[in-house]
């Protein structure tokens, strides 16, 4: 992420803007006129917004196609310049109101604050939470940034503070109205006078301190990053990524991308209480190992840490997402996964539990214990799993052993477990991830993958693990 000069976001008056055609991809009948209008408003709002006179800066992209390509590039989507379902899905996710691309001058602003001791004031409160819960969320959000910089934040109870925090709905006094429930959640202004540093939260949202509604701490920590001078990040694992994702109840750790950004502005603090900040995996890292792989409705999902790559057929560039951005109720990290295509289900394993999912939805009654599959109670986790649709059998790997589960009769096959080395000689005594395709099983062990022929029962090729990601 490159910290830069932010300007206050502009929510435009569309009736004064000259409409430009928005190209769509595939079957245009799949996209409604409402979707096309929504996409155009989105692009005008977040990619080279106009100034108050409705005039684009001369060096800004002026066509909808160019803006759409920028948006697809920003979010790591296939860059086609055409509106498709995947692009529209990203556009419809709840997000911050600050633009992703576009530099424009409305209010005077600076790159960063010229002082390290900043003040903030909570002007009003949301009715969704107690005053104490709101104050705790904001204090915790500021601490995210003060932990890694020399910045100090002091709360004022009256008067004018550097960062004025308020809740409002629709038009709330800054000419940049909110849009009702979901969609645009909040916005903040960059360092500077007047509105500089101020953060506004849409009170049409349901604010909480949990996974329900929108977590106020997470949104506030993001907005305060803008208040301090940070732009949006293209890194889907960064706090400053524009799309909201609930990241779990465990102790929050500021991702490395955000640490690098804020420290480039203010320098490091004296002592970082959490020196190990999570990094986003690099798909072309030669030492990359993978956690799990599964197909899902014709696509391939490749899991690593709290992320997964989504690989479409006939597409080279894999799209990277946080796992919780698709399945908020799943753990951040998973151990294994497999698809049961005829039932339109995927099964996800983490520790002693497993989940059954239909698309985005977790089936009722899950998670269940892996011991319910017939595994002995001493098995603490499944490290890899692969399903064979023609036989209805699923291989489950744990440690140096493999079990075979009968998905049709819901029992574990006899004569199992077996040693991995005996059934699949040459691949090693453990499996990190596995999938099957066209009569071959692909075993992943550390940074290496083995292409194993089912017919000849032998290894036919050894490749880097990340070759599945076209590296």
From Swiss-Prot:
Binding locations of Ca(2+) 4: 291, 335, 383, 432
Gene name in the database record: MMP13
Protein name: Collagenase 3
Region (Disordered) residue spans: 263-284
Chain residues that bind Zn(2+) 1: 172, 174, 187, 200
Function summary: Plays a role in the degradation of extracellular matrix proteins including fibrillar collagen, fibronectin, TNC and ACAN. Cleaves triple helical collagens, including type I, type II and type III collagen, but has the highest activity with soluble type II collagen. Can also degrade collagen type IV, type XIV and type X. May also function by activating or degrading key regulatory proteins, such as TGFB1 and CCN2. Plays a role in wound healing, tissue remodeling, cartilage degradation, bone development, bone mineralization and ossification.
Tissue: Detected in fetal cartilage and calvaria, in chondrocytes of hypertrophic cartilage in vertebrae and in the dorsal end of ribs undergoing ossification, as well as in osteoblasts and periosteal cells below the inner periosteal region of ossified ribs. Detected in chondrocytes from in joint cartilage that have been treated with TNF and IL1B, but not in untreated chondrocytes. Detected in T lymphocytes. Detected in breast carcinoma tissue.
GO molecular function: calcium ion binding; collagen binding; endopeptidase activity; metalloendopeptidase activity; serine-type endopeptidase activity; zinc ion binding
Cofactor(s) needed: Ca(2+); Zn(2+)
Gene3D superfamilies: Collagenase (Catalytic Domain), Hemopexin-like domain
Superkingdom of this protein's organism: Eukaryota
Positions that bind Ca(2+) 2: 162, 194, 196, 198
Record PTM text: The proenzyme is activated by removal of the propeptide; this cleavage can be effected by other matrix metalloproteinases, such as MMP2, MMP3 and MMP14 and may involve several cleavage steps. Cleavage can also be autocatalytic, after partial maturation by another protease or after treatment with 4-aminophenylmercuric acetate (APMA) (in vitro). N-glycosylated.
Region (Interaction with TIMP2): 176-246
Residues at the active site: 223
Motif Cysteine switch positions after renumbering to this chain: 94-101
Induction comment: Up-regulated by TNF and IL1B.
Propeptide feature ranges: 20-103
Sequence ranges of the Hemopexin repeats: 281-330, 331-377, 379-427, 428-471
